[in-house]
From Swiss-Prot:
Biological function: Transfers and isomerizes the ribose moiety from AdoMet to the 7-aminomethyl group of 7-deazaguanine (preQ1-tRNA) to give epoxyqueuosine (oQ-tRNA).
The protein, known as: S-adenosylmethionine:tRNA ribosyltransferase-isomerase
Pathway connected to this protein: tRNA modification; tRNA-queuosine biosynthesis
Name of the gene encoding the protein in the UniProt record: queA
Database matches in Pfam families: Queuosine_synth (PF02547)
Species assigned in the record: Salmonella dublin (strain CT_02021853)
Cysteines joined through disulfide linkages: none
Amino acid sequence: MRVTDFSFELPESLIAHYPQPERSRCRLLSLEGPTGALTHGTFTDLLDKLNPGDLLVFNNTRVIPARLFGRKASGGKIEVLVERMLDDKRILAHIRASKAPKPGTELLLGDDESIHATMTARHGALFEVEFNDPRPVLDILNAIGHMPLPPYIDRPDEDADRELYQTVYSEKPGAVAAPTAGLHFDEPLLAALREKGIEMAFVTLHVGAGTFQPVRVDTIEDHIMHSEYAEVPQEVVDAVLAAKARGNRVIAVGTTSVRSLESAAQAAKNDLIEPFFGDTQIFIYPGYQYKVIDALITNFHLPESTLIMLVSAFAGYQHTMNAYKTAVEQKYRFFSYGDAMFITYNPQAISERP
C-alpha cells in the first residue's frame, strides 16, 4: 500500500487552533463500520450511543511542559523537546540547533538561562541530557517548560494550554502530546456516563513526539513505527474480559488506547489480553486483525498519517476516506483541538485495501 493512498485535501481554515469553549460541545461524526453510514451530531450524543455495561478505555497520561528554550554555553541557540523522562535527573530529547551538540556540551535553559544541563550521549536522532540541578526533572519542566503544542497549531503556547491541552482525568505525567480524543470529556459528561452504567478503565501510554513525525517512505509496509511506553494493568484486563463475557462492547477513547490494548493482546499468550508494561512499536494499518476493541472515539487525523491508517484498518478504507471527505465538506474542525468521530468496527475491513 502506498502512503499517498491516505492523502486528502484539507483547507487550512479547518485546522483548529483553539478548543471549543465547552469541551463536550464539539461536533461528532458517527461512522457505522459495517455499512459506512454517517450521522452528524454533538459529542454528548455518546450518551445515546453507549449501552449500560459498555466499557470505555481511557489513556490517563498527562502532558508535561516538554519544550525548553536556551542556548549552548558556547553561544548557539537551541530548542529542546523532551521525548521521555529517563529518571529524576535525565531526559531523552530532540534538540534543534544550527549545529548538533556533542557529548559534554553545556546547555543553559530557561528564559533566564538559570538551568544548567549537560548533553551526555547521543542515541540516533535523540540526545540524552542530564540536569545539574537538585530538583527532579518534572519540577524543572513545570518551572521553565512550555506546553508542546503540535506543529500544526501555528501559535505560541499560552498559560491556558496547561489545562486545555490535558484531559480532565490525566494523572500520570510523561506525554509530550495529549491523547486528544479524551479532551472532549468533561466532568458532567463523565458523571452522566457513570449514571447510565457505562464502565470505565484507564491505560497509560506516554505519547511521544514521534506521533507527529511524517511517514517518510512511499510504501507503508516499510515504515518503522516510533516507540512509546504503555501500561495495561490487571484491572484493565479484568474489565475488558468482563465486558466481553457479558456481551458488552469495549470502546477505546483515542488511538493511544487502541494501541495500548492491542499491544497487550499481541503480547498475550493464553488469553485474549494480558497485562502489559513496556515499550510498544505497534503499527496498525489495513490488513490488521483487531483483537479487543469494538468501537473507537477519535479525532480527525493528518493526511498520510499512521493514525488515519489505523482508523482505515478499523472502519474500512473506503468508509474512512468517504467520512473524511464528508467531514471536510461539512467543515468539521480537524486535529488536536478539533471535532471527534465515533466509529463502530467493520469486520470486512481486514480484507479491504486501497
